[in-house]
Amino acid sequence: MKFTSVLAFFLATLTASATPLYKRQNVTSGGGTVPVIITGGPAVSGSQSNVTTTTLFNSTSTLNITQLYQIATQVNQTLQSESSSGIIIVTNWRSIETLSFFCSIVFNTSKTIVITENFLWGVPILSSSDAEGRGTLVAGRDKVVYSGVFPPYTVPVGVLSGQKNVQWFFDACEPTLIASNSTIRTQYSNFTSAQISSNASSGTNTSSSSSSPLVPIIYEEGYSQSLIQSLSSSIQGLVVVSSGTSHNSTVASWTSVDFPVVYASDGSSGHDGSGIGFISNTSIPQGAISAGYLSPIQAQTLLSIAIHNQVTSSSELQQIFPVSQQ
């Protein structure tokens, strides 16, 4: 079951994204305008006032790294407007985790970025003056506001009170991983570039670090030497979902592979189906990198961003994953 899912994901990510559809719709009434980017999910109702929508995709599957950077380009254009206090990005439920974490890393801004399945859930958040300076936020259907840096729906930072107000649980602050003095912000400011190389859409066979990296996720118990050999010529990085402690690992060492390998813990496999896992440097095979508290999908996203920006050495990657900050 898991191996089939991995192969399906692998094949899906091999497919280049289609040229995005840019469709603008203005829904007006008095007052300020709420900018909304649609990448999937329900359509914006034409009766809703003060909303300007830009439709990039109508995706029902998980957004790939090329699509994420295309979204980033559009978001940058919107955030550069002096009249913009932030933006709402609507996506499908499968992409909530990937998109919210990607935006957390790529956008170094105090302006509010809200990721949601329904733009109506994001409007009160964007309208709140206290939303700024918290990093990317996720608006859930349960009326709770979550941090986009952590696995989805695990770290609440506020709750909708009524239909228009947000009750924040604490004063605005950014998570350590993306704080202004963090390693990512001080040493890897190029991560905030929203541009993807033109090589990503060209027909030339260039280095993956200058195009769209392919970073699949596999489960440790499904590991086999033949699987790695079949993937090694096509992938630029790998995320392994840990099966437990180091003495249970089916792999002794990853030092012989020529791509970075990150081990992550799946907190969603807990008894309640959700949560935050953690894996330390002492719980992984030699040559691998620990994702710390990041979920497998978040580890995949951060590793893809790093490879895209030509950060591939083990020493550099160890600095940007949160386990180094423990």
From Swiss-Prot:
What induces it, per record?
Induced at very late stage of sporulation.
Protein family: To yeast YGP1.
Query: Does the record bear Glycoprotein in its keywords?
Result: yes
Tell me, in a sentence or two, what this protein's role is: Serves a protective function during the early stages of spore wall formation, and contributes to spore wall maturation.
Q: Which GO terms describe its biological process?
A: ascospore wall assembly
Top-level taxon: Eukaryota
Q: Which species is listed as the source? A: Saccharomyces cerevisiae (strain ATCC 204508 / S288c) (Baker's yeast)
Q: Glycosylation: which residues?
A: N26, N50, N58, N64, N76, N108, N181, N190, N199, N205, N248, N281
Q: What is this protein called?
A: Sporulation-specific wall maturation protein
